[in-house]
């Protein structure tokens, strides 16, 4: 409180509590301009006092941002001959007054209005740079509330000095040391970081772009290098596999030439396509049909299947050529290929004798088949197969002949059939059905006639 009483405005009578005349707002603006002009030429001692006053102002401030509006009341320093009576020093001395005064108070509110005057006087020297600085820095440069003890100073004054040198050392450090020393290290650090951000803010996009571009090139180069590192191995492996498969797999011309030679050799040796397929199944376990061999010779199989079948056919040809000198081996191979016997043609007279024997006995015994084969000079197996085929033929013909009898039963009632209607039925045939069955039959034919 002693400090507050020391810097209270003095009236014309020289007392600390005296009430002097109030100054008009226009005169207050002129006084503020004069104070700013003197502040720009102040010495080191004044700067020390300014530090003290600014520090006290920040410590005892109400924490409300104030602008540069014209104050309603401006106390004057026209009295007493103290050290701080009058002049720009008095204005800054008044700034350390009590910060709890109201704007409409004459004495107690002088501290608040003195802060307004101090705000205008302290930053009037940088008023020429406030507009452009605010345009460049923007509201994002305002310090945080905790940077200077909870007080939020105006961003246009201190921040203008951060970008544009003022009268007090120049630059950010000079202005902080001269006019903003009481702001504390927190605000200094915030301003320092904000200044760097303001300087680097336009440059990050190109920097990031260049870095991203270079990093993208490096990353792409790394990927290409990795791909190039992996690709030769994979490519080499694939090429080696491809070369290996190309060496093993024949070309289309080789397959065409082999198919032509195989067909000529097969015909010359007397084997059919079915014989070759069966022989392959007997020799190598892979049974091929006659259609497959035919398609191989006609080059109608797929390239993969042609490549698979060619080695087997080539082995079969080699086996056949090696056994061509010995008829026994050749007959053995031919017998292996010809598992199905040839079709036997029977003469008309022999066929008639077999037919007459079939009418007598459709299913002869083994002894009868042997005697019949000897009498007809046929093989026993031929006679047996003929009787089997004849019985199958009879079965196929009998259902067609018996298919006409059921309609006869539907047309004629059982009672209307005469004694000879049964044909081969014996005399002890069952009697005709009772009238009830006949009535039931008529019930189905004429449902409306019988109730």
From Swiss-Prot:
<dbReference type="InterPro" id="IPR050255">
    <property type="entry name" value="POU_domain_TF"/>
</dbReference>
<feature type="DNA-binding region" description="Homeobox">
    <location>
        <begin position="339"/>
        <end position="398"/>
    </location>
</feature>
<dbReference type="GO" id="GO:0000785">
    <property type="term" value="C:chromatin"/>
</dbReference>
<feature type="region of interest" description="Disordered">
    <location>
        <begin position="127"/>
        <end position="154"/>
    </location>
</feature>
<dbReference type="GO" id="GO:0008366">
    <property type="term" value="P:axon ensheathment"/>
</dbReference>
<dbReference type="InterPro" id="IPR001356">
    <property type="entry name" value="HD"/>
</dbReference>
<keyword id="KW-0678">Repressor</keyword>
<dbReference type="GO" id="GO:0006357">
    <property type="term" value="P:regulation of transcription by RNA polymerase II"/>
</dbReference>
<dbReference type="GO" id="GO:0000978">
    <property type="term" value="F:RNA polymerase II cis-regulatory region sequence-specific DNA binding"/>
</dbReference>
<dbReference type="InterPro" id="IPR016362">
    <property type="entry name" value="TF_POU_3"/>
</dbReference>
<feature type="compositionally biased region" description="Gly residues">
    <location>
        <begin position="76"/>
        <end position="85"/>
    </location>
</feature>
<feature type="compositionally biased region" description="Basic and acidic residues">
    <location>
        <begin position="190"/>
        <end position="199"/>
    </location>
</feature>
<feature type="compositionally biased region" description="Gly residues">
    <location>
        <begin position="11"/>
        <end position="20"/>
    </location>
</feature>
<comment type="similarity">
    <text>Belongs to the POU transcription factor family. Class-3 subfamily.</text>
</comment>
<dbReference type="Pfam" id="PF00157">
    <property type="entry name" value="Pou"/>
</dbReference>
<dbReference type="GO" id="GO:0010628">
    <property type="term" value="P:positive regulation of gene expression"/>
</dbReference>
<feature type="compositionally biased region" description="Gly residues">
    <location>
        <begin position="95"/>
        <end position="112"/>
    </location>
</feature>
<keyword id="KW-0238">DNA-binding</keyword>
<feature type="region of interest" description="Disordered">
    <location>
        <begin position="395"/>
        <end position="451"/>
    </location>
</feature>
<dbReference type="InterPro" id="IPR000327">
    <property type="entry name" value="POU_dom"/>
</dbReference>
<dbReference type="InterPro" id="IPR010982">
    <property type="entry name" value="Lambda_DNA-bd_dom_sf"/>
</dbReference>
<keyword id="KW-0804">Transcription</keyword>
<dbReference type="InterPro" id="IPR013847">
    <property type="entry name" value="POU"/>
</dbReference>
<feature type="compositionally biased region" description="Pro residues">
    <location>
        <begin position="427"/>
        <end position="436"/>
    </location>
</feature>
<protein>
    <recommendedName>
        <fullName>POU domain, class 3, transcription factor 1</fullName>
    </recommendedName>
</protein>
<keyword id="KW-0010">Activator</keyword>
<dbReference type="GO" id="GO:0005667">
    <property type="term" value="C:transcription regulator complex"/>
</dbReference>
<dbReference type="Pfam" id="PF00046">
    <property type="entry name" value="Homeodomain"/>
</dbReference>
<dbReference type="GO" id="GO:0000981">
    <property type="term" value="F:DNA-binding transcription factor activity, RNA polymerase II-specific"/>
</dbReference>
<keyword id="KW-0539">Nucleus</keyword>
<dbReference type="GO" id="GO:0045893">
    <property type="term" value="P:positive regulation of DNA-templated transcription"/>
</dbReference>
<feature type="region of interest" description="Disordered">
    <location>
        <begin position="1"/>
        <end position="21"/>
    </location>
</feature>
<dbReference type="GO" id="GO:0005654">
    <property type="term" value="C:nucleoplasm"/>
</dbReference>
<dbReference type="GO" id="GO:0030900">
    <property type="term" value="P:forebrain development"/>
</dbReference>
<dbReference type="GO" id="GO:0022011">
    <property type="term" value="P:myelination in peripheral nervous system"/>
</dbReference>
<dbReference type="InterPro" id="IPR017970">
    <property type="entry name" value="Homeobox_CS"/>
</dbReference>
<feature type="domain" description="POU-specific">
    <location>
        <begin position="247"/>
        <end position="321"/>
    </location>
</feature>
<feature type="compositionally biased region" description="Low complexity">
    <location>
        <begin position="220"/>
        <end position="232"/>
    </location>
</feature>
<dbReference type="GO" id="GO:1990837">
    <property type="term" value="F:sequence-specific double-stranded DNA binding"/>
</dbReference>
<dbReference type="InterPro" id="IPR009057">
    <property type="entry name" value="Homeodomain-like_sf"/>
</dbReference>
<keyword id="KW-0371">Homeobox</keyword>
<keyword id="KW-0805">Transcription regulation</keyword>
